Amino acid sequence: MEKQRYERPVIKKLETNMPNKYGLRTEYRPMTHIDGVEVTQLIQDHGSPLFVISEQTIRRVYREAKKAFATRYPKVQFAWSYKTNYLDAVCHVFHQEGSWAEVVSGFEYDKAIRNGVDGSKIIFNGPDKTEMDLEKAIKNESLIHMDHLDELYSVIELATKLNKKPKVAIRVNMDTGIYPMWDRFGFNYENGQAWDALNKIMRSEKLELIGLHCHIGTFMLSASAYSAAAYKLADLALGVKKKYNHDIKYIDMGGGFASKNTLKGSYLPGSDVNPTFDDFAEAITSALINSNFEPDNLPLLILETGRALIDEAGYLLGTVISNKRSSLGKRTTIVDIGVNILFTSFWYDHKVTPAQPFTQYTEDTTIYGPLCMNIDVIRDSISLPLMNKGDHFVIHHVGAYNMTQWMQFITLRPKVVMIDANSNVHVIRKGETIDRITEFEAIPKHLEGFEL
Amino acid sequence: MQIKKNIAISESGYIFNPSSGESFSINPTGVEIFNFIKEGKTYEEIEQLVLEKYNTDKDTFDKDYHDFIGFLKQYHLLDYGEKEN
């Protein structure tokens, strides 16, 4: 007779009217498959931990976002935010869907070019563009979004040197009623810096002012702030039209849309309370349409949202190493996923679902990663179904930033696989090896050899 | 070591301690072990019964059993009378 699945014995004191930080049970069904592929099989074939990206989910979410904007505004263009996830396979899915590239460094710029993106469809943002980067961007007719006056002067100089008219926009920061106000990037709207930069561009006659850009924050939980931002950019664009009789071709509203993750400290789950693409689209497009643009001459609306497009498509599979008790008797579970590969666990209460059947019994648990570091906490407090040593689980919504901000620290970074629409599994990034890490190192001659 | 005589347990794992008014919930494996202790079975007997029925190993059971007993102690559900071991 086949033995039954073992669940450790637990006893829980029943207390009423005692709210606590662990919350209620959130998991009701195990996640045994991702896009038709068994989780245990994925771990068997590719090891644990393992990042899994669902191609179908990327395409579905992208199309939802596109639809939300395109049904409200006639000219919409998305540009894939490389820093959010610049694995080539991921970028290719977005480019196949029609996204341009939005990059913030020479490295990312080169990655976009290598991916086959036409230079004129690359938006070059960020405060650090070297002269070499700018020269490349000018020659490729990329869209240069200027962050500061030093950059503006460099671009004017390069335009003269190369005898080309670079296509430029300025990044504008502004008060949209949210805290904190992001004012470190670009030129301020309220104090006149933005107008100062626009006047310099128009008067120089060396640059083609093609757009206006803003990016008001990150993980925005209020769609109305985008409305304020869109009105202010529209005001600048209409001012340029009036003053210089020059049409601004596009308004780039940047990104910062919240994904469905739950921020730490949030009382309700992000999937229930965070604004939807429709909410953001309604705020932005209404502001642009209701401003004084001529109805037949509306600027192109560019969106650079990253997190909200890719978070849901990313899963991180892991394995339980041990169940322990803390000094106070609190249940702690150690898993093989550390904060070095799940950077976002500092921001979010990630949803964790066991990959095998479980009962309705849970324990208030702290999930620790495997790193020998006190900061390595994946969930401070979670009402977690009972899992045994060696059991597998799935962490949800990890597609944004984890595969770019991860660190090779203490242990090696795992593989990344992508599951296509036909449930085929493709390795899109190999796991690291010790040779790969040490090949960058060198030992000076006098340090070779020692006796212990 | 015995379960205190006045402690009541239902089939679904609801435990009531009439002397303190406290109530507890335990999962099915917990109910089984709780009842085995109540029946006066030794650790070795309980271990054998659990390993026969469930897909687990000695080490895991040993660790989980003592963890469970620790909580029964903490919640004052155990009685250390003549049979203490």
Feature-to-residue mapping (PLM):
Chain B
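Acidic, low-complexity/disordered tracts enriched in E/D and polar residues
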Residues: 1-31, 35, 81
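Long, charge-rich, low-complexity alpha-helical segments
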Residues: 25-85
